[in-house]
């Protein structure tokens, strides 16, 4: 689903979610840092990248865990923290701060009703030795791939086609088992991720890692880059990036001040169903699809 016709409203809504997130962090003394395209947007555009369609933040694991605990008993008004622990149909390991007055289903194959959101990625401690940290990242990735396989609802043809190639036989086996015990497998994989995520003490670690990130081994970097954060203007507010923002951004993106080619300036997120006006139930959505 293309959002070009509602881009202004979309951006205003997710910016409001970011402001609500920052207010929560300030009220409860939680650390956060903008990351990925949001960090580039802050440094290069002093706001959202014009063609970007989401907002991403990192939270050190101790603060992330505190946020999830706080969200169990605090009322955030029209916002809610959606996690793999409080929503059985939620297919991801990281969490989102969601506007509960909107409706969004991102993928037909992973049907989960949420709303417009800000992504909240836990930032975990990892080993001081880079090669050991890389091995742990590979283990994370393997577990996340299994979680994706378990939570994706394929058509019968897509399911059978996994038998056509030897390299997808393992995924076929996982999906076959998941058909009979999807919930149990999902919980087990999340438990495995939790165990790996809490293996190292964040306060004592030299290196950190975003286990759900998209930049492979670049997701491992020195914790000292984070510091207390550095303020940047962002639209009509201010946000925090890692204290060594330039070092952090160059590590991930090289010359981040240079615009990408025109053909790469596109939205990257899926939207199977969207209602900007209210939260709908499954029955209401099914009648429209």
Over which residues does each language-model region extend?
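Conserved catalytic core of two-metal-ion nucleotidyltransferases
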Residues: 2-26, 68-128, 146-164, 168-254, ...
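Active-site nucleotide-donor binding segment shared across nucleotidyl transfer reactions
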Residues: 22-55, 59-65, 224, 251-252
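A short secondary-structure junction signal
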Residues: 129-135
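Short, His- and charge-rich active-site/binding loops that engage polyanionic ligands
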Residues: 137-142
């Amino acid at each position: 689903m293309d959002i070009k016709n509602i881009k202004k409203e979309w951006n205003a809504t997710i910016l409001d979610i970011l402001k609500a997130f920052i207010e929560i962090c300030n009220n409860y003394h939680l650390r956060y840092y903008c990351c990925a395209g949001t960090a580039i947007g802050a440094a290069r555009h002093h706001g959202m990248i014009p063609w970007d369609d989401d907002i991403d933040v990192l939270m050190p694991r101790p603060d992330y865990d505190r946020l999830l605990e706080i969200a169990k008993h605090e009322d955030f008004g029209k916002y809610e923290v959606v996690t793999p622990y409080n929503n059985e149909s939620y297919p991801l390991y990281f969490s989102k701060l969601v506007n509960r007055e909107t409706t969004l289903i991102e993928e037909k194959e992973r049907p989960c009703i949420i709303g417009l959101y800000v992504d909240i990625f836990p930032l975990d401690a990892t080993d001081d030795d880079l090669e050991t940290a890389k091995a742990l990242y590979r283990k994370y990735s393997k577990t996340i791939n299994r979680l994706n396989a378990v939570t994706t609802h394929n058509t019968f043809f897509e399911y059978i086609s996994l038998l056509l190639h030897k390299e997808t036989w393992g995924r076929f086996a996982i999906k076959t088992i998941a058909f009979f015990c999807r919930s149990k497998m999902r919980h087990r994989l999340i438990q495995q991720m939790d165990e790996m995520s809490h293996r190292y003490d964040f306060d004592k670690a030299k290196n950190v890692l975003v286990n759900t990130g998209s930049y492979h081994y670049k997701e491992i970097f020195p914790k000292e880059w984070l510091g207390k954060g550095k303020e940047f203007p962002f639209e009509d507010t201010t946000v925090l990036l890692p204290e060594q923002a330039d070092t952090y951004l160059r590590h991930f993106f090289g010359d981040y001040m240079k615009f990408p080619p025109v053909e790469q300036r596109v939205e990257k997120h899926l939207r199977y169903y969207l209602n900007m006006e209210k939260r709908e139930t499954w029955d209401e959505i099914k009648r429209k699809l």
